[in-house]
Curated annotation (Swiss-Prot):
InterPro entries: Tombusvirus_p19, VP19_sf. Belongs to the tombusvirus protein p19 family. Residues 1-15 have a biased composition (Basic and acidic residues). Coiled coil: none annotated. This is RNA silencing suppressor p19. It comes from the Viruses. Keywords: Host-virus interaction, Inhibition of host innate immune response by virus, RNA-binding, Suppressor of RNA silencing, Viral immunoevasion. GO terms for biological process: symbiont-mediated suppression of host innate immune response. Homodimer. One of its GO terms (cellular component) is virion component.
């Protein structure tokens, strides 16, 4: 009975934090606070006639442990600096620690999900494979958010990767 009460308290804390956008709580796997756009900001960047369109200001990601789900919306400006910031939104250690609050002797399902530019990736597995699951989630997140050469910050010509001019000179 005591274990069930503790579990319910943890779920209530997770539910409150999920919607209040808090960070740094003892249960959340996320290190950054929720950065969801305001209603006004959302309307400025979206066409109301297209209901399934993502907000171009960032991306959504979530971690689920059994019935408890932690969600975040993070701003992402598609620059190298922004990429490094959002890649640090959680670590394997923070995920393991958060999951340990909900794991018992039985194996439960663990899920990571990310949605960016209309592409959604979900990775799931049992709690006994959590380390492997978080490694796969990190790789998936990096690949999905990977910058194209046009989006890389550069001193040369902002958007043009170094070496382009050299290649053009050689081909002439």
């Amino acid at each position: 009975m005591e274990r069930a009460i503790q579990g319910n308290d943890a779920r209530e804390q997770a539910y409150g934090e999920r919607w209040n956008g808090g960070s740094g709580s003892s249960t959340s796997p996320f290190k950054l606070p929720d950065e969801s756009p305001s209603w006004t900001e959302w309307r400025l960047h979206n066409d109301e006639t297209i209901s399934n369109q993502d907000n171009p200001l960032g991306f959504k990601e979530s971690w689920g442990f059994g019935k408890v789900v932690f969600k975040r919306y993070l701003r992402y400006e598609r620059t190298e600096t922004s990429l490094h910031r959002v890649l640090g939104s959680w670590t394997g250690d923070s995920v393991n620690y958060a999951a340990s609050r909900f794991l018992g002797f039985d194996q439960i399902g663990c899920t990571y999900s990310i949605r960016f530019r209309g592409v959604s990736v979900t990775i799931s597995g049992g709690s006994r494979t959590l380390q492997h699951l978080s490694e796969m989630a990190i790789r998936s997140k990096q690949e999905l958010l990977q910058l194209t050469p046009v989006e890389v910050e550069s001193d040369v010509s902002r958007g043009c990767p170094e070496g382009i001019e050299t290649f053009k000179e050689e081909s002439e």
